[in-house]
């Protein structure tokens, strides 16, 4: 199996597990799930609250949340995410990553733990040097995919994405958990929207840097 196909499948499996675990945990916690989206882009299939989209590389779980929607005055909001105890507000966004981390470490063992710890520095270093450090890291990833089976490739890929999702930026699981801690379990805070916007910028910059690095790597690989 080519590295490209392996990484594409790994991304799809990661997304499926990540989103599913968060949705299951939300319902187990008694939180109303408004919608579950697997993938991005045009919707291919809708079944109840579940939406399957064209590109299986991301997804999201939309929860009942008074910060995002207007509810009836007589609604006690006991099933709203932001009215849950602090531990639920922190644990829920981390649940998908925790499940994937446990699965990946189970596949790779001790070397997987070292890969996970190293991923934080690699993500930052690669974003700061997309034409050098990132190219080297992408090359190492391709070499690993060419010399190992899909299970190990998925585990390594998942460990790197788990590390990325734990970074303290808005829109990522780590940022969501951090904002919940900063609110100290309160349903909302006046400063939260402003802080979230500032927390979003470095995450976007990092993603754009890695997207550019990947584009350059593919361009060079094709000999263009």
Labelled PLM ranges:
Residues 86, 173-174:
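Alpha-helical structural motif
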Residues 167, 178-180, 213-216, 224:
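Membrane-embedded alpha-helical bundles that constitute the cytochrome b-like, heme-associated redox core
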Residues 3-73, 167-170, 176, 180-181:
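Small-residue-rich helix-interface/hinge motifs
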Residues 15-20, 24, 105, 162, ...:
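Transmembrane alpha-helix boundary/anchor motif
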Residues 158-172:
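Transmembrane alpha-helix interface/packing and boundary motifs in multi-pass membrane proteins
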Residues 73-160, 184-210, 214, 221-222:
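Functional transmembrane alpha-helices
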Residues 2-17, 148-162:
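Membrane-embedded alpha-helical segments that form the functional core of polytopic membrane enzymes
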Residues 26, 30-34, 111-115, 172, ...:
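Perimembrane helix-loop junctions in membrane proteins
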